[in-house]
Design a protein with these regions (language model features):
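Short, acidic/polar
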Residues: 12-25, 44, 70-80, 167-175, ...
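Conserved, mostly hydrophobic/aromatic
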Residues: 5, 25, 33, 52, ...
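Active-site acidic/histidine proton-transfer and metal-coordination neighborhood
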Residues: 23, 31-32, 46, 55-58, ...
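Hydrophobic faces of well-ordered beta-strands that scaffold small-molecule active sites
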Residues: 3-7, 33-35, 59-64, 88-90, ...
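Glycine-rich, proline-tolerant flexible connector loops at the mouths of alpha/beta enzymes
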Residues: 33-53
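Active-site beta-loop-alpha junctions enriched in small/polar residues
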Residues: 6-10, 36-38, 64-67, 93-95, ...
Length: 257
């Protein structure tokens, strides 16, 4: 299994210089990226395409805010055409759904398969990336995640191990529930730290937390997941990516024995 990087992890360096921010990843042997936290314009697309042409690294997906996925289809598609990327990921549930009425949520759910078809006609697969808001229960007792799955048929999903585990759900169980609708996985570990009188969850280097990543990778292979990317909110991104990558490679090598 190949392990890429979600560029939210290196967002500060990427904002300063895309090319220089990718070089340490290339040196680590990273060959796949899910690109996030940049302007999806032609200038950046041209730069990423040039990097891909000179190095063994490519975008497997781009994570885009809902307002652009729905409101600027031509711009998003153009970015994908230039970079050779075939997957677009809706970054999150719109704030109108998180804070608004259930009617707004169900309206968004109803729009997903329709938007999937629009991108599919352009040769692009559309997926949805979740956080922990999707595990909140609605007035009918079902979670938003359950409704997202049951009321759509085409939209793919990108799973986030951290947000699932933080919500008290087993990541490998959620992966199997997604089944063949799982497109990719954000690999993030979960740890806890004391803050005053509270115990606060946070993401951490893979292997330093509580998530069973062997179970995650086994489930990912079982359902035919297309890509996996390391993601973490950290002040030392390259060091932490390297440590996470080493841990995942050890798990991967043991699985082949």
């Amino acid at each position: 299994m190949n392990f890429g990087v979600q560029t939210f992890t290196i967002r500060k360096a990427q904002k300063k210089d895309i090319y220089k921010s990718y070089l340490p990843l290339i040196e680590m042997g990273i060959s796949e990226l899910e690109i996030a936290r940049i302007d999806f314009n032609e200038k950046n697309a041209d730069e990423i395409w040039a990097i891909s042409g000179n190095h063994n690294i490519r975008p497997v997906s781009i994570q885009v805010k809902p307002k652009y996925v729905f409101g600027d289809v031509d711009g998003v598609v153009r970015f994908c055409e230039i970079t050779g990327c075939k997957n677009v990921v809706i970054s999150m549930l719109p704030f109108s759904c998180i804070l608004g009425s259930e009617e707004k949520f169900y309206s968004f759910v109803d729009s997903l398969d329709k938007q999937y078809e629009i991108y599919d006609k352009k040769g692009i697969t559309l997926a949805y990336h979740h956080h922990n808001w999707e595990y909140i229960r609605l007035s009918n007792g079902k979670t938003r995640m359950a409704e997202l799955l049951s009321k759509t048929k085409k939209i793919k999903f990108v799973h986030d191990t951290y947000w699932t585990a933080r919500s008290g759900i087993s990541p490998d169980a959620q992966i199997r529930e997604f089944g063949n609708r799982l497109l990719g996985i954000h690999l993030r570990d979960l740890a806890f730290k004391k803050k005053f009188l509270d115990v606060v969850p946070h993401d951490t280097v893979i292997g330093d937390g509580v998530i069973d990543f062997k179970a995650v990778l086994d489930a990912a292979q079982e359902v035919g997941c297309e890509y996996t990317v390391i993601e973490q909110k950290t002040d030392t991104p390259y060091e932490d990516i390297k440590r996470s990558l080493n841990h995942l490679m050890k798990i991967n090598s043991r699985s082949k024995e």
